[in-house]
């Protein structure tokens, strides 16, 4: 049974950084349970507000329903008791419902509803998709607004009015006008989190739009740096944010943008660079080249991001 009510979960998640852990794979690309458990234990040893298993960074789109359930179950079992674990619902409505119910059975506290893969649908279709998932579980549900799943402000308002367990809106578009309409309609009824790739890049300006948190992919391999960056954002220390952007984040983006699909691959490359290998990515994604990993390793060293450590009292 979930420890958090949907609203309590929303209140908890909005006040801290969010982890989206990579799913570890063996050489044959089967899930490496031992390596994944070790990664979850390490991630949840830091003061993050929540951990989203089998999300985008976790290659949820490449997991079977059974693998999704198992990965979420392992995350629940391995995570620190202080860190709530959320599952991810992907694919068709039927698949998403199976993922959501599997997450609840595994002991997760909530569910992130990802866009249905390569399926174009209108506003009513998206409403029905999200509504079906909300009806299938008692867990708090967060929708991910991105790519082929652009939820209109009216749809988000309808969902928030009808389903008490609909708790959050994750944005992966950066459309300020769209976000302003949603936050105006829904106000504090929902919590809002940034979901653009390498969300740190946009975190400070989006804070002004009510997005008090975001999904941090780089937390996977440089958690101390990621938490320090988040603290600077919440303190609205623009000078510190700009310095970290200049020193590490923007050069990191240059490596990420060398090939399509590197948004996930660079996270696993980062883990390899810091000595925490989680294996490769599943096709059709491809791994970073050896030169890309070498360049990333150099950047981690020269920027200090790879060796940055939070004060002990902050990590406690």
From Swiss-Prot:
<dbReference type="GO" id="GO:0047448">
    <property type="term" value="F:5-dehydro-4-deoxyglucarate dehydratase activity"/>
</dbReference>
<dbReference type="InterPro" id="IPR017655">
    <property type="entry name" value="Dehydro-deoxyglucarate_dehyd"/>
</dbReference>
<dbReference type="InterPro" id="IPR013785">
    <property type="entry name" value="Aldolase_TIM"/>
</dbReference>
<protein>
    <recommendedName>
        <fullName>Probable 5-dehydro-4-deoxyglucarate dehydratase</fullName>
        <ecNumber>4.2.1.41</ecNumber>
    </recommendedName>
</protein>
<dbReference type="InterPro" id="IPR002220">
    <property type="entry name" value="DapA-like"/>
</dbReference>
<comment type="pathway">
    <text>Carbohydrate acid metabolism; D-glucarate degradation; 2,5-dioxopentanoate from D-glucarate: step 2/2.</text>
</comment>
<dbReference type="GO" id="GO:0042838">
    <property type="term" value="P:D-glucarate catabolic process"/>
</dbReference>
<dbReference type="Pfam" id="PF00701">
    <property type="entry name" value="DHDPS"/>
</dbReference>
<dbReference type="GO" id="GO:0008840">
    <property type="term" value="F:4-hydroxy-tetrahydrodipicolinate synthase activity"/>
</dbReference>
<keyword id="KW-0456">Lyase</keyword>
<comment type="similarity">
    <text>Belongs to the DapA family.</text>
</comment>
């Amino acid at each position: 049974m979930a420890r958090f009510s949907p609203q309590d979960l929303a209140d908890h998640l909005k006040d801290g950084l969010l982890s989206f852990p990579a799913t570890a794979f063996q050489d044959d690309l089967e899930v490496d349970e031992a390596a994944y458990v070790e990664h979850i234990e390490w991630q949840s040893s830091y003061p993050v507000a929540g951990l989203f298993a089998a999300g985008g960074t976790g290659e949820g789109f490449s997991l079977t329903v059974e693998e999704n359930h198992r990965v979420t179950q392992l995350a629940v079992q391995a995570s620190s008791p202080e860190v709530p674990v959320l599952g991810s619902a992907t694919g068709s409505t039927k698949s998403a419902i199976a993922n959501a119910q599997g997450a609840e059975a595994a002991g997760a506290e909530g569910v992130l509803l990802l866009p249905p893969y390569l399926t174009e649908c209108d506003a009513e279709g998206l409403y029905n998709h999200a509504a079906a998932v909300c009806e299938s579980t008692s867990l708090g549900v967060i929708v991910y607004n991105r790519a082929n799943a652009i939820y209109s402000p009216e749809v988000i308002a309808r969902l928030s009015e009808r389903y008490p367990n609909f708790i959050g809106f994750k944005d992966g578009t950066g459309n300020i006008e769209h976000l302003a309409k949603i936050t105006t309609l829904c106000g504090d009824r929902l919590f809002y989190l940034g979901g653009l790739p390498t969300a740190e890049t946009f975190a400070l300006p989006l804070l002004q739009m009510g997005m008090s948190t975001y999904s941090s992919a780089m937390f996977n391999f440089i958690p101390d740096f990621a938490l320090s960056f988040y603290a600077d954002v919440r303190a609205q220390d623009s000078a510190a944010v700009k310095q970290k952007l200049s020193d590490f984040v923007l050069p990191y983006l240059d490596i990420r943008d060398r090939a399509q699909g590197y948004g996930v691959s660079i996270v696993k490359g980062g883990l390899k660079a810091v000595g925490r290998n989680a294996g490769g990515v599943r096709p059709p994604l491809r791994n970073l080249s050896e030169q890309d990993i070498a360049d990333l390793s150099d950047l981690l060293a020269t920027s200090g991001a790879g060796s940055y450590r939070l004060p002990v009292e902050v990590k406690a």
